[in-house]
From Swiss-Prot:
Homodimer. InterPro entries: ATP-grasp, ATP-grasp_carboxylate-amine, ATP_grasp_subdomain_1, PreATP-grasp_dom_sf, PurT, PurT/PurK_preATP-grasp, PurT_C, Rudment_hybrid_motif. The gene is purT. It comes from Escherichia coli (strain K12). One of its GO terms (molecular function) is acetate kinase activity. This is Formate-dependent phosphoribosylglycinamide formyltransferase. PROSITE patterns: ATP_GRASP.
Length: 392
């Protein structure tokens, strides 16, 4: 039996978000729908999830002592990481002391960097992956590239949104690629992964839920990347029945090996009927924002339902749908959005994240659309996103 308390009362059920961006904001909203008390934590003030939380704290989440202090102050029943850059060793300690880390501290630590999850997938689970080598010096990096061959990709073992990533076609790029990788890591300079380039027809995110009533799959989400970050996503991505079966089997093995209850974003390459594992996030995925309009239960609702110990039951997908990011480039601490009336309509929505500032290029919102076909849904979402005029 699952018992939920009432927020701001002695018996409240308390959830602490570690990372309070746009994904955490939607998780907070889903917690609020169930009367759960939300504490939002991030490295900067006025982060999106803080707008809809009961309380918030600004700390360096890579500082284990600071993390322990805020946990001891708030005494959450669930600690829900939204990002990779967290003191995961402290999360393991806290879990050993009886706290509930979502989905579990081991999953958070393994997926914090690409080495942990790649070794689990390729070496322990024997899943198909790209060829890869790890390196922690420039000389070993050059050896890894020589071993893998051209073209290849170098990434910091801990980064997101394409930061520090270079597609390497020739030896002339090596010095700059190493330097860029050292600048792009979320926890500073360090180890990198060199990967062989995989031949694929398309990439998918298979949103996979591990819950008290078993493992559940959303329809596959297709997406387009640019500069290492997603620009559009759509659902469902068409693929052969055999490829879908293989994708689900890979995802099932990964989430069960990681353990715990919650939603996982499993990234896969698909080439014909063949499926290759890429990465996994033990939390809602940015490409999954399309589920805000495409499903009866969004990825955020599914995550909350699962980690609270509630059954998922089933997931209803409504048909062709898409998301397109609102990605302006400017510098401002007082952003406004004009022409919004032309970005909404029947089966057409937007989400504006409420980020407090922008300095360069930053994702500030997303347009969501449904249509008779995926192609039409993508075009509707892109058009709507383009209608929003961001000023500052």
């Amino acid at each position: 039996m699952t018992l939920l308390g009432t927020a701001l009362r002695p018996a409240a059920t308390r959830v602490m978000l570690l990372g309070s961006g746009e994904l955490g904001k939607e998780v907070a909203i889903e917690c609020q729908r169930l009367g759960v008390e939300v504490i939002a934590v991030d490295r900067y003030a006025d982060a999106p999830a803080m707008h809809v939380a009961h309380r918030s704290h600004v700390i360096n989440m890579l500082d284990g002592d600071a993390l322990r202090r805020v946990v001891e102050l708030e005494k959450p029943h669930y600690i829900v990481p939204e990002i990779e850059a967290i003191a995961t060793d402290m999360l393991i300690q806290l879990e050993e002391e009886g706290l509930n880390v979502v989905p579990c501290a081991r999953a958070t630590k393994l997926t914090m960097n690409r080495e942990g999850i790649r070794r689990l997938a390729a070496e322990e689970l024997q899943l198909p992956t790209s060829t890869y080598r790890f390196a922690d010096s420039e000389s070993l990096f050059r050896e890894a590239v020589a071993d893998i061959g051209y073209p290849c990709i170098v990434k910091p073992v801990m980064s997101s949104s394409g930061k520090g990533q270079t597609f390497i076609r020739s030896a002339e790029q090596l010095a700059q690629a190493w330097k860029y990788a050292q600048q792009g890591g979320r926890a500073g300079a360090g180890r990198v992964i060199v990967e062989g380039v995989v031949k694929f027809d398309f990439e998918i995110t298979l949103l996979t839920v591990s819950a008290v009533d078993g493992v559940h799959f959303c329809a596959p989400v297709g997406h387009r990347q640019e500069d290492g970050d997603y620009r559009e996503s759509w659902q469902p991505q068409q693929m052969s029945p055999l490829a879908l079966e293989r994708a689900q089997e890979i995802a099932r093995k990964v989430v069960l090996a990681l353990g715990g209850y919650g939603l996982f974003g499993v990234e896969l390459f698909v080439c014909g009927d063949e499926v290759i594992f890429s990465e996994v996030s033990p939390r809602p995925h940015d490409t999954g924002m399309v589920t805000l309009i495409s499903q009866d239960l969004s990825e955020f609702a599914l995550h909350v339902r699962a980690f609270l110990g509630l059954p998922v039951g089933g997931i209803r997908q409504y048909g062709p749908a898409a998301s397109a990011v609102i990605l302006p480039q400017l510098t401002s601490q007082n952003v406004t959005f004009d022409n919004v009336q032309n970005a909404v309509g029947a089966d057409l929505q937007i989400r504006l994240f409420g980020k407090p500032e922008i300095d360069g290029s930053r994702r500030l919102g997303v347009a969501l659309a449904t249509a008779e076909s995926v192609v039409d849904a993508i075009e509707r979402a892109k058009h709507a996103a383009g209608q929003v005029k961001v000023q500052g």
